[in-house]
Amino acid sequence: MLTLKLITEETDRVIRGLEKKHFKGAREAIDEVLAVDKKRREAQQQLDKNLSDAKKMAAQIGGLMKEGKKDEAEAIKAQVSQMKETNKQLEQQMNDAQDEMTRLLCPIPNIPYDEVPEGAAAEDNHVVKSNLKECGPNDTVGNWDVNPSLGIANPLPHWELAKKYNLIDFDLGVKITGAGFPVYIGKGAQLQRALINFFLAEAAKSGYTEIMPPTVVNAASGYGTGQLPDKEGQMYHCEVDDFYLIPTAEVPVTNIYRDVILDESQLPIKNCAYTECFRREAGSYGKDVRGLNRLHEFSKIEIVRIDKPEHSKESHKEMLAHVEGLLKKLELPYRILLLCGGDQSFTSSICYDFEVYSEAQGRWLEVSSVSNFDTYQANRLKCRYRRADNKKTELCHTLNGSALALPRIVAALLENNQTENGIRIPRALVPYTGFEIID
């Protein structure tokens, strides 16, 4: 949630940022917040004046009583009594205004950093890095410098490879649950487990503490990280208990620090978690949902950082380097994109996506988003810290990223490593799989 301080002190910058994010009615929304804040401040000013006057009147009452002017003292007492009733009304007005401001601020997204490019959708994102020798603007790919010896004519898509080698049964998942809930079998299941353990081990090497959180959260947690109300329609909701299945471990792990005041010495906090993730993905269809491309349940490792404002940009760079390192070790063709304002998430200030190239599908698949949320999530969470030399608390910066989401990584591994003799396992993964080839 945007801070009122930012909105009041940098109104024009906030409006420009919201417009960059293609938030409709940006100026009207901010004007409405400012109007309610004006009412709150007016009530606060009147309350402060009344309290000051009441203090003076109390001193007058004492003096009048000493002088034997009881009638005058009683008259002032009546005024003070009436003022107390007025003050109660003013306090209620302030509370109502605060509630109204929170209601108005809740659906307003975060504003992007200045370096975020203009643009309305994915086609306006900027490719900032790739390990491909050739990477055209329209998803055309030439030779890539990772495993050039593995290329074969007419590569099969991962859903055909999964069937050929008995790795994943999509039909069985439909029988048990429905579309988007695959069943992993044999080496397919072992590959999943190997990737999870590999990603967690790499996160530990980078200083992340592993958390094993619940995969069901309450509404307050969904609100804290910004999934609610923005993504309510995409989350599975257990209506009887008013619980939500998590779409990402970001939700429970970040909410550990909801309503917490940290000491400066505790920062940065670096946590990671493996969880199953659940997304309704309403409106997805066609090639986007084939095979592992888009699932309702999937495995993902998330990295989460909480840091001081002056350190968060460097923390973001470290997280980007961590995710890139994973893709390098998996020997996959990848690229990194800086998302434009219109393609950013509701809560992010800046976001980079990592995509891997699907050899058989001939297109890029997103496998990670790494975001800095500035104080936006922290303000909703009331996640603060206190500097060693200052009693006043400040909002933390929160960051997170996928490191990594498994389905499309598995798809890319199968497609990009298929040979005439089977599917090769990247060297870094062999200690975790216990086998070098799927045949």
Q: PLM features: residue spans?
A:
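N-terminal alpha-helical targeting/anchoring segments
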Residues: 1-135, 140, 145
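TRNA-recognition modules of translation machinery and tRNA-sensing kinases, especially anticodon-binding
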Residues: 27, 133-439
